[in-house]
Amino acid sequence: MAGLGFWGHPAGPLLLLLLLVLPPRALPEGPLVFVALVFRHGDRAPLASYPMDPHKEVASTLWPRGLGQLTTEGVRQQLELGRFLRSRYEAFLSPEYRREEVYIRSTDFDRTLESAQANLAGLFPEAAPGSPEARWRPIPVHTVPVAEDKLLRFPMRSCPRYHELLREATEAAEYQEALEGWTGFLSRLENFTGLSLVGEPLRRAWKVLDTLMCQQAHGLPLPAWASPDVLRTLAQISALDIGAHVGPPRAAEKAQLTGGILLNAILANFSRVQRLGLPLKMVMYSAHDSTLLALQGALGLYDGHTPPYAACLGFEFRKHLGNPAKDGGNVTVSLFYRNDSAHLPLPLSLPGCPAPCPLGRFYQLTAPARPPAHGVSCHGPYEAAIPPAPVVPLLAGAVAVLVALSLGLGLLAWRPGCLRALGGPV
């Protein structure tokens, strides 16, 4: 007797439903072809003090390099991260730094620029300071002024649309209910700190937590009122504030104005490397907890915790070993998150796509969080509409010349971003 077939089987409809609902199976991993890394700077001094801080009068002694500056511990953390990256990519990267293989960009802050340099000293020890003079060589770290940085420092403070979205989140019933429950706590904290906290942006409370945590990490005694319960409550308040910035409502639109910009740049850089056959293997971004939080929000991976110092989120692009036509392309994307040097990095999966995720599926799932082709508000007239810059300056320059010959120099003059593209990856 002939078989019932899929549709004739009593369980057929249920099996079809499971096939539609369950995420696709994971694909086998293949050889590595490109890596993008986004990491937070290392340990730093507090960003600020507060009026009743018992250590305020000796701050210049405690933090001789100044508030917000990288500490010796921060340098050590970044050296360790660089050594971890060297061990992870030993067979992928050349043993010595090659400008055509690795590109590094940082925000224009001392702590992130120094963190990038310390990281590179661990990643390329042959070129690190302290090596024999004949072998030591500095490695360039690229940056742009803070006011012009829309890739790693997002225009949240100056973006009216983002403020509308944030106001919608902070006026939501759930947010207001949580805030009301902390009114008494914040009022008591005002008496201990000398700060106005009730009715003020929650970032003020976060700054108190940041100062206390920095002091505690460096062995300084905390005031009696700063109990573990107080620190825990401050962390919960901080998580509520972060959630309003990167989470629902309208999380995807927030991402288009923040972390989706960086996500788009990472994907665009890989696309150009593949399309033009460029030798670039790795792009590194030295930035802040806010950068990582926004990127986690764009990926749907924010877990309610602030990234620790030297936390690193990695994107690994691989040629996969399956059937490209069947599995949605010949490249996969895997994510990892290193947030604790004592443990192996955590493999992450994009919601809806187990790792390694086919690149086409990755593009599809992240599309709502990335800026649309026509651009978004709060960005310049050209930057949002022009594809991110080509990577590797010399080869990109050759491509730009060919474009100029075929399209005419007038087009490049009309689109100044194309000329800016000669500076390297975004």
Curated annotation (Swiss-Prot):
Glycosylated residues, chain numbering: 191, 269, 330, 339
Enzyme class: hydrolase
A cellular component annotation (GO) from this entry: lysosome
Stated consequence of mutating residue 133 to K: In AI1J; uncertain significance
Enzymatic reactions: a phosphate monoester + H2O = an alcohol + phosphate
The EC number(s) this enzyme carries: 3.1.3.2
PROSITE patterns assigned to the protein according to its UniProt record, in alphabetical order: HIS_ACID_PHOSPHAT_1 (PS00616), HIS_ACID_PHOSPHAT_2 (PS00778)
Tissues of expression: Expressed mainly in the testis. Also expressed in the brain where they are enriched at the postsynaptic sites. Expressed at lower levels in the trachea, prostate, bone marrow, spinal cord, colon, fetal brain, heart, thymus, fetal liver, spleen, leukocytes, ovary, small intestine, pancreas and skeletal muscle. Expression is significantly lower in testicular cancer tissues than in normal testicular tissues. Isoform 3 is expressed in the testis, trachea, prostate and bone marrow.
Keywords from the UniProt entry: Amelogenesis imperfecta, Disease variant, Disulfide bond, Glycoprotein, Hydrolase, Membrane, Signal, Transmembrane, Transmembrane helix
Annotated PANTHER family: ACID PHOSPHATASE-RELATED, TESTICULAR ACID PHOSPHATASE
Subunit structure and binding partners: Homodimer.
Function: May dephosphorylate receptor tyrosine-protein kinase ERBB4 and inhibits its ligand-induced proteolytic cleavage. May play a role in odontogenesis.
Record disease entry: Amelogenesis imperfecta 1J: A form of amelogenesis imperfecta, a disorder characterized by defective enamel formation. The enamel may be hypoplastic, hypomineralized or both, and affected teeth may be discoloured, sensitive or prone to disintegration. AI1J is an autosomal recessive form characterized by hypoplastic enamel, enamel discolorization ranging from yellow to black, and normal dentin.
Family: Belongs to the histidine acid phosphatase family.
Name of this protein: Testicular acid phosphatase
Lineage start: Eukaryota, Metazoa, Chordata, Craniata, Vertebrata
Protein encoded by which gene: ACP4
